[in-house]
Regions:
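Residues forming the flavin
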Residues: 1-54, 60-166, 170-190, 194-561
C-alpha cells in the first residue's frame, strides 16, 4: 500500500443527485470511500450553463491509501496529479540603509497590504490615513445616510479600510498571480471568512470586511508599524528630484525618503498637489453611468431556473456587456452586489455619487449593479486632471437634480427607455412585495430603506428625475441600447421592476501616476504610486496585490529600518 496526496480537478456534483463530495471524488479516482484519509476543497464554483442540470464544480486535495500499482494508474489520469505545495517566496533585501521610516499614504487595501508586508520584515512603516478610525467612520456614514449631514473628512471614500469598507467585499480579480493565495491567507488570518480561500467568486461582505481591516491594522502594529488616522498629507517636500518629506494637516513636516502613495481614487485634492509638484501623471479612461436595482428573485430565476433558491447555490449574480456597432462604446455591469443596497458615496460637498454594497449574508432581496459606459480622454480632455473635472460635473448635476440635499435622482428602467415621465411606483410595488428581511450588526442599520419597504434603497432618499439630463448623451444612449440587450439575456432586466439611480462616476481612477519598472515615480525618486488611486488596480484584490509588489520593490532596494 502507498499513501498519495493528489490534486484532483473538475469534480462535478449535480444538484439533481443526492451525493457527497467524497463519493464524487471516489468515482473520479475509481476507489472506495474507505481509501480516503482526507479530502480538502481548494476551489468551488457553480456551473449554471445548463439550467436543467446545474452542477457544483470542485478542485480538491485528496490524501488516499491504495495499492502502489493502482496509485501509479490514478496519477496518469486527466485532471489528477501529485500535489506539490507552493512555498511563499522570501523577499530579497537590499543593501541601502534607510535613514527614515517608510510612510504609506492611505489605509485602503493597497496601503494596508503594503504596510503589512513591510512591517513583517522589520521596516516599521508609518501609515497615514486622512479619514477617521473605523468605528467612528461607520457612525459618520450612517448619520449621513440617515440625515444627509455630509462630512468631507469621513465618508464612504475616506477612512480606515478605504472605499472597500462600504462595498460588497468582493475578493475576485482577473490578475493571475501566485501571490493571491498568500494575500487571501493573510485576509483570513485577519478575520475574513475562511471560504474566500476556496470560492470561485469570494466575497466578505462589508460587515466581515470591517473585521478584516481591524485585524490587518492590529497585525501591522504588532510588527512595529504605526497607523495614524485623521492625518492628511497636504504637501510633498521635494529636494533635487526626490521625495524628502511630507507636510501634514497639523503643520508637522515629516522627514522620509520612501513614500507609498496609496491615496485611493477619490483623493482629488492630493491629485492637485501632485500636479503642482510636477509629479508625472496622465489622464486615463474610466467609466460612468447609473446603478440599477431589481428583485433578487428575478436574477436568481434567470440564472438558476428551477434551482433558484437552492440552499447550496446562494443568490445569483450577473456580468453583462454590450458593444455598440462601431465598437467605440460599451455598456457593462460593474461591481454587481447580490442581496445588497445602493449607497451614497460622495466625498465632496455638493456632489452625489452612488455605489453598491452587500453584507456577508446578501439577504436584502434586492440585486444591484452599476451599469456604466466607457469614457476616454477623447471625451473629456488629455490634461491629467481633466477626468476629475468631468466626474465632478456630473456629480454636481446629480446633486442639483436630487434637490441639493444629497438625495439622488432616480427613475424606473421603463421610463428611462421610453423617455416617459419618471415614475417608480410600479417598480416600488413589486420590490416591496419581493424584498427579504435582514438583521442588524455592529450598529449598522442594514439594508436601510430596503427593509423598511421603501424603494429605491439609496439613502438619504431619492427624487424622481429624467436621468438623460444628468449624463452625456453618448452615455445615456449607450445605456439604453445596453439595457434592451441585457433584457434579452436576463428576462425582465429591462422591465417595469427595474430602478435606476445616479450617478456612478468612481468606477476607477481618472488618471495614472506614472511609474517605472522599479515601481517608483518616473519623475520623483522615492515616491511609489500604488493601488487603484494611482491607476494600477481595479478592486480590493488587485489593489492589495499591487501593495504587496510595491512593498517588495522597496525591500529589494533597502535594508530594514
Amino acid at each position: 500500500m502507498t499513501v498519495l496526496k493528489l490534486r484532483v480537478n473538475d469534480i462535478r456534483m449535480s444538484l439533481r443527485k443526492e451525493q457527497t463530495l467524497k463519493e464524487c471524488v471516489a468515482d473520479k479516482l475509481g476507489i472506495k470511500k474507505s481509501a480516503f484519509r482526507k479530502v480538502q476543497v481548494v476551489h468551488r464554483a457553480v456551473d449554471a450553463r445548463r439550467k436543467n442540470n446545474i452542477c457544483l464544480l470542485y478542485h480538491v486535495i485528496a490524501e488516499i491509501e491504495v495499492p502502489q500499482s493502482l496509485g501509479q494508474k490514478i496519477v496518469k489520469r486527466p485532471g489528477i496529479s501529485l500535489f506539490v505545495p507552493v512555498q511563499a517566496e522570501s523577499p530579497h533585501m537590499g543593501d541601502i540603509p534607510m535613514t527614515e521610516r517608510p510612510v504609506v499614504i492611505g489605509a485602503g487595501p493597497a496601503g494596508l497590504v503594503a504596510a503589512l508586508e513591510l512591517a513583517k520584515y522589520g521596516y516599521r512603516p508609518l501609515v497615514l490615513e486622512r479619514g477617521r478610525a473605523l468605528h467612528k467612520r461607520v457612525e459618520d456614514v450612517n448619520r449621513f445616510w440617515e440625515t444627509g449631514d455630509f462630512d468631507p473628512a469621513s465618508n464612504v471614500q475616506f477612512g480606515m479600510g478605504g472605499a472597500g469598507t462600504f462595498s460588497d467585499g468582493k475578493l475576485t480579480t482577473r490578475v493571475n498571480d501566485p501571490v493571491m493565495g498568500e494575500i487571501l491567507q493573510a485576509f483570513v488570518k485577519a478575520g475574513a471568512p475562511g471560504e474566500i480561500l476556496t470560492e470561485h467568486k469570494p466575497h466578505a461582505g462589508t460587515d466581515k470586511l470591517r473585521d478584516m481591516v481591524q485585524g490587518l491594522a492590529a497585525e501591522i502594529e504588532s510588527y512595529g508599524g504605526e497607523i495614524c488616522c485623521e492625518t492628511q498629507v497636504t504637501d510633498f517636500v521635494v529636494k533635487e528630484g526626490r521625495i524628502a518629506g511630507l507636510v501634514l494637516n497639523n503643520g508637522t513636516v515629516l522627514s522620509t525618503e520612501t513614500v507609498v502613495l496609496a491615496c485611493g481614487h477619490s483623493a482629488r485634492d492630493t491629485y492637485h498637489v501632485l500636479a503642482e509638484k510636477g509629479i508625472g501623471m496622465e489622464a486615463k479612461a474610466f467609466a460612468i453611468g447609473l446603478r440599477v436595482e431589481h428583485p433578487q428573485s428575478l436574477i436568481d430565476k434567470a440564472q438558476y431556473g428551477d434551482f433558484a433558491g437552492h440552499p447550496r447555490l446562494g443568490v445569483a449574480d450577473y456580468a453583462l456587456v454590450y458593444h455598440t456597432e462601431d465598437r467605440k462604446r460599451a455598456a457593462y455591469s460593474f461591481c454587481m452586489c447580490p442581496g445588497g443596497q445602493v449607497v451614497a458615496a460622495a466625498s465632496e460637498a455638493g456632489g452625489v455619487v452612488v455605489n453598491g454594497m452587500s453584507l456577508y449574508n446578501r439577504d436584502s432581496g434586492i440585486a444591484n449593479s452599476a451599469l456604466v459606459v466607457n469614457v476616454t480622454p477623447e471625451d473629456f480632455g488629455t490634461e491629467p486632471l481633466a477626468g476629475v473635472a468631468f466626474q465632478r460635473k456630473y456629480e454636481k448635476l446629480a446633486f442639483a437634480a436630487g434637490g441639493k440635499n444629497y438625495k439622488a435622482p432616480a427613475q424606473s428602467v421603463r421610463t428611462f427607455l421610453e423617455k416617459a415621465r419618471p415614475d417608480i411606483k410600479d417598480a416600488q410595488k413589486y420590490l416591496r412585495e419581493s424584498a427579504g428581511q435582514g438583521s442588524g450588526r455592529d450598529g449598522v442599520k442594514q439594508n436601510c430603506s430596503v427593509w423598511a419597504g421603501v424603494f429605491p434603497s439609496y439613502r438619504p432618499g431619492v427624487t424622481e428625475y429624467a436621468l438623460d439630463s444628468i449624463l452625456p448623451s453618448y452615455v445615456s444612449d449607450t445605456l439604453k441600447q445596453g439595457l434592451r440587450y441585457f433584457g434579452q439575456r436576463i428576462h425582465g432586466f429591462d422591465g417595469p421592476t427595474g430602478i435606476l439611480t445616479g450617478v456612478e462616476t468612481r468606477t476607477s481612477a481618472p488618471l495614472r501616476i506614472i511609474r517605472g519598472a522599479d515601481y517608483q515615480s518616473v519623475t520623483h525618486e522615492g515616491l511609489y504610486p500604488c493601488g487603484e488611486g494611482c491607476g494600477y488596480a481595479g478592486g480590493i484584490m488587485s489593489a492589495a496585490l499591487d501593495g504587496y509588489h510595491v512593498a517588495r520593490a522597496i525591500m529589494k532596494k533597502y535594508k530594514p529600518f
